[in-house]
Amino acid sequence: MPVQKFLKTFLWLVAIHSCLVGIFLIILPESWLAFFGYIGYRRSFFQVQGGVFHLVLAITYLWAARNPLRDQSLVIITICAKGIATFFLLLYYLLIEPIWIVLLSALGDFLMGSIILILFINLKKQNQPAKEVS
């Protein structure tokens, strides 16, 4: 599978993941929060806001997936979003509250961002004009 097609497909999968996480955050009943490690946590505006933010990111990922070579800035935003999410989630897990789903989310964002970065670098290498040999 060519690199661009693989990157497009992977960005679609990341967008679907983000959309599902967003919807899940918005509709998750308060009674389920303890299962995910949020003991004593009460549903709040910020939970729903996080869900809406995931939906916004999903749109960005879908736009990046349309043509990653033409819309390189959207791919870079995607990589940055995954890097920032990884950093934030790891810090939260290590310094604030060791919630297992937060650590799992950090690892997932790191993996997704790393794969996108590797594919993007390979796509750019593959599409560089050949250098003339004199």
Model regions: which residues?
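Membrane-helix boundary elements
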Residues: Q4-S44
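Core segments of alpha-helical transmembrane spans in multipass integral membrane proteins
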Residues: C19-F24, S44-A65, I77-G83, F87
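Membrane-embedded alpha-helical segments of multi-pass transporters/permeases
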Residues: I26, L62, L90, S114-L117
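Short helix-capping/hinge motifs at transmembrane helix termini and TM-loop junctions
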Residues: L28-P29, G37-Y38, P68, Y93-E97, ...
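Non-cytosolic membrane-interface motifs at loop->transmembrane helix junctions
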Residues: F35-F45, S73-I77, P98-G108
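Membrane-helix boundary connector in multi-pass membrane proteins
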Residues: R66-L69, F87-L104
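Hydrophobic alpha-helical segments of small multi-pass membrane proteins
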Residues: V75-L89, S105-I116
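Membrane-water interface at the C-terminal end of transmembrane alpha helices
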Residues: L111-S134
